[in-house]
């Protein structure tokens, strides 16, 4: 093999190796930042994984919100109509956060409690995030829950 071919072979091998390394690093970064959406029923079934980071979607159960006077930490339950999951959050809640409203929280399970890192609340009476609406639609139909449109199980 002449020197020019050998140099070209090393260059091609180096480029393939660098491309593989870059692909691996991108895949690892994306995997760490992906947070799948689960309902309380799916979490309690074990679909979310014991220590993985995920998003919890559902409705804030009426009468479940608790916060000590002067404290930032809040506790509440998120429900999908079939199951409830306790949530703990130690930051400032969004202005639109209310009981009976849709919420999506990102965090992890710790000792049977979902410890949220971030909480998003819906922005008006009729809006519900599409992912939450899709996952909760069957629970709403099952329990004949009326929606803003006035029909049971129909989420918009």
Curated annotation (Swiss-Prot):
GO terms for cellular component: plasma membrane. Residues 136-156 are annotated as: Disordered. Keywords: Cell inner membrane, Cell membrane, Cytochrome c-type biogenesis, Heme, Iron, Membrane, Metal-binding, Signal-anchor, Transmembrane, Transmembrane helix. It is a single-pass type II membrane protein. It is found in: Cell inner membrane. The chain crosses the membrane at residues 9-29. GO terms for molecular function: heme binding; metal ion binding. Disulfide bonds: none annotated. Residues 30-156 are periplasmic. GO terms for biological process: cytochrome complex assembly. Heme chaperone required for the biogenesis of c-type cytochromes. Transiently binds heme delivered by CcmC and transfers the heme to apo-cytochromes in a process facilitated by CcmF and CcmH. Belongs to the CcmE/CycJ family. This is Cytochrome c-type biogenesis protein CcmE 2.
């Amino acid at each position: 093999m002449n020197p020019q071919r050998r140099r070209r072979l090393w260059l091609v091998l180096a480029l393939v190796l660098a491309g593989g390394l870059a692909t691996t690093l991108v895949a690892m970064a994306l995997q760490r930042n992906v947070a799948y959406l689960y309902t309380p029923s799916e979490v309690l079934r074990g679909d979310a994984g014991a220590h993985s980071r995920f998003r919890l979607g559902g409705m804030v159960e009426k009468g479940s919100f608790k916060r000590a006077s002067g404290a930032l930490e809040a506790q509440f339950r998120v429900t999908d109509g079939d199951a409830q999951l306790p949530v703990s959050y130690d930051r400032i809640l969004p202005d639109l956060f209310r009981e009976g409203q849709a919420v999506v929280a990102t965090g992890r399970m710790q000792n049977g409690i979902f410890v949220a890192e971030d909480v998003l609340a819906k922005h008006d009476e009729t809006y519900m995030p599409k992912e939450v609406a899709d996952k909760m639609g069957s629970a709403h139909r099952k329990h004949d829950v009326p929606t803003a449109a006035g029909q049971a199980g129909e989420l918009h």
